[in-house]
Design a protein with these regions (language model features):
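A short helix->loop->beta-strand "cap" motif at the edges of active sites that frequently abuts
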Residues: 118-120, 238-241
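Short internal beta-strands
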Residues: 126, 242-246
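Short, glycine/acidic-enriched loop or turn micro-motifs at the edges of active sites
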Residues: 104-106, 129, 155-157, 220-222, ...
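Short internal loop-to-helix segment that lines adenine-nucleotide cofactor pockets
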Residues: 76-100, 149, 161-163, 179-238, ...
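Core alpha/beta nucleotide-donor-binding catalytic domains of modification enzymes
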Residues: 136, 140-171
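Internal alpha/beta domain cores that form substrate/cofactor-binding pockets in large enzymes
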Residues: 200-206, 211-237, 243, 250-277, ...
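S-adenosyl-L-methionine
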Residues: 1-147, 187, 191, 209, ...
Length: 324
């Protein structure tokens, strides 16, 4: 019966009128089912989940920690959350020795990096105490205590203590994760609650905890200029690749642009189709908010993959060692 139906459908595909009839009938069903699936994903959230990674290991997100992230992974797997950024980081996870996760949240990328590459050392910075507790639980749950160092501080251009602006959560068990240290932000304009957090310059942090940095991820809600300012010494020394979210802002992200330009880094837009060289350090396009800041560049405007950049960086490092 099933075989006969399959045969009939195959024949119908090759017939203009039958294919028109079947496609016209199927389109409303497809629309309804797609809308229903989207509605289910939005309304039915997964509080805690575990997924199998391609290398055979399991990655778990604990209950009451990153419910939105856990839900995305539950419904769509590894590429369910920030797929282009995730694929970019996974490329570098395979090759890097040290990864610094700035604005780690519940630790998705810290966990993924450590599980993706057993030799990778990870340092995760998350200043919000409630979110930080979830980060620690996730590290413990995935048995990564010895490989992921969790720091309950915010990276900044200054070391000390300052106000952190945390919008009210819309409900559920998630702690609102769009908080920021930026004083000129929508969070402040909307009367977000304030908590006091510890801040540290990454250059000072590495003086106390020596490391050579290969890869940095920054997701700090309009505070990336201060984070980059506080780690300029490490960036100039180690020339790591930096994956950074830069959202369109009224100030045009001019400080970020000047810092990146001063470090002699080349920004690339991270897109579904590949990596596009950013002309004139343009961080203002609303539909493109995730960037790869590269210490090297190739002549190509569009890159399908990152092998060329990595190999160019390796050659540059070898030349520096020979020069020394």
């Amino acid at each position: 019966m099933a075989h006969d139906l399959t045969t009939l459908l195959k024949r119908a595909r090759d017939n203009y009128y039958l294919s028109l009839l079947l496609a016209s009938a199927a389109k409303p069903l497809h629309f309804v089912s797609t809308r229903a699936a989207l509605c289910l994903e939005q309304k039915v959230r997964r509080n805690g989940t575990s997924i199998r990674l391609p290398n055979g290991t399991n990655m778990a997100i604990a209950r009451d920690s990153g419910v939105g992230i856990a839900s995305a992974l539950f419904w769509h797997g590894l590429d369910g959350y920030e797929p282009e950024t995730s694929r970019t980081l996974r490329f570098f996870f395979e090759r890097a020795a040290t990864f610094v996760d700035v604005g780690a949240n519940c630790g998705l990328y810290s966990l993924l990096g450590a599980l993706w590459n057993p030799g990778l050392q990870v340092v995760a910075f998350e200043p919000v105490p409630a979110i930080f507790e979830g980060l620690k639980r996730n590290v413990l749950l995935n048995q990564l205590v010895g490989r992921v160092r969790c720091e309950n501080v915010a990276l900044s251009s200054q070391t000390g203590r300052t106000a952190f602006f945390l919008p009210k959560s819309e409900g559920g068990r998630d702690v609102e994760s769009t908080g920021t240290l930026a004083r000129e932000s929508w969070q402040v304009r909307k009367g977000a609650a304030q908590i006091e957090v510890e801040t540290v310059r990454f250059d000072e942090y590495t003086a106390r905890h020596p490391m050579r940095v290969d890869l940095i991820k920054i997701d700090v809600e309009d505070f990336e200029a201060d984070v980059l300012e506080g780690m300029k010494g490490v960036i100039a020394r180690d020339r790591p690749f930096v994956v950074c979210e830069v959202l369109p802002r009224l100030h045009g992200n001019q400080r970020t642009r000047k810092i990146v330009e001063g470090l002699n880094y080349q920004p690339y837009w991270i897109t579904p189709a590949g990596y596009v060289k950013v002309p004139k350090f343009d961080f203002g396009r609303g539909n493109l908010t995730d960037f790869l800041l590269s210490p090297v560049a190739t002549p190509d405007v569009v890159l399908d993959g990152l092998d060329g950049l990595w190999e160019s960086k390796e050659r540059s490092c070898q030349q520096d060692r020979i020069a020394l």
